[in-house]
Amino acid sequence: MKVLAIDIGGTKIALGNVVEGHLQHRKQFPTPVVNDATTLAKEILAHCQAWLSDVDVIGISTTGLVSEQGISAINPGTLSFPTPFPLHSELHRLSGKPVKMLNDAQAAAWYEFLQLSPELDVRNMAYITVSTGVGGGLVINQQLHKGKSNFAGHIGHTVLDPNGPLCGCQQRGCVEAIASGNAINAGAQALFGQAISNIELFQLAQHNEQASALIQQSAEAIAQLCLNLKATLDLDLVVIGGGVGLAHGYLARVQAFIDKQPLVFQVKVRAAVGDYDACLLGAAFQFEESNLS
């Protein structure tokens, strides 16, 4: 099968030509500010016009809540599309291709499960993306668990500190408000008095204790989330992805915090097989649906 894979993130949109499960070509562009799905669908198709005639289907993975009506942002600070945003319908109308759409972390969870399960005999696992926001996907009893309203896996909006910072979802102390790329960036700006990218912050953290402490706070929040998920779902494995999650040294911080906790709560964490493109590949692999509930 030949799939046009589209990954909609808060910062960028990635496009891939996936042939028989392999990413053949890839490109990306910054997520634009748009008021209607038609405009974005046209822009996406213009970027991948050279692939379009050759693909069989279109797969979308996106941050936010996915429904038959479209995309709805749980945190408008990470995705500012009008709600609901019927991107899938417009891509189908303009291209004539069959289109499927799935939450990005759910899509990545399914992709990672398909890659890891034969080797590790995984039955229950979570995928956590630490990027602009924090998202998650759950595979339970070897099936992708989406829930009745497709809301399952929005673990970035579980609360760690009820007195913590206000999240864009309007709860206080969400994992996303503490650990996300946006949260780290806001903390760095408050600390250093100027805008500093997360890439620069990770470099600075190698010799600056304040920068290192910001990253450590994020890593410990994600580690605590992993511990909570182990206690709730008895997971075999947690896979970490996203621009922050895959940054040098971040995963080691997460695992080190987990390893200090009581053994019964500990869970193995590992980096995404799909690296920075786990969500993009997941967009294509949602068509591999033998246990995609």
UniProtKB/Swiss-Prot annotation:
Pathway: Amino-sugar metabolism; N-acetylneuraminate degradation; D-fructose 6-phosphate from N-acetylneuraminate: step 2/5. GO terms for molecular function: ATP binding; N-acylmannosamine kinase activity; zinc ion binding. One of its GO terms (biological process) is N-acetylneuraminate catabolic process. It is an enzyme of class 2 (transferase). Pfam families: ROK. InterPro entries: ATPase_NBD, ManNAc_kinase_bac, ROK, ROK_cs. The keyword Ribonucleoprotein does not apply. The keyword Transferase applies. It catalyses: an N-acyl-D-mannosamine + ATP = an N-acyl-D-mannosamine 6-phosphate + ADP + H(+). Its EC number is 2.7.1.60. Zn(2+) binds at residues 157, 167, 169, 174. Keywords: ATP-binding, Carbohydrate metabolism, Kinase, Metal-binding, Nucleotide-binding, Transferase, Zinc. PROSITE patterns: ROK (PS01125). ATP binds at residues 5-12, 133-140. Catalyzes the phosphorylation of N-acetylmannosamine (ManNAc) to ManNAc-6-P. Belongs to the ROK (NagC/XylR) family. NanK subfamily. Homodimer. This is N-acetylmannosamine kinase. It comes from Vibrio vulnificus (strain YJ016). The gene is nanK.
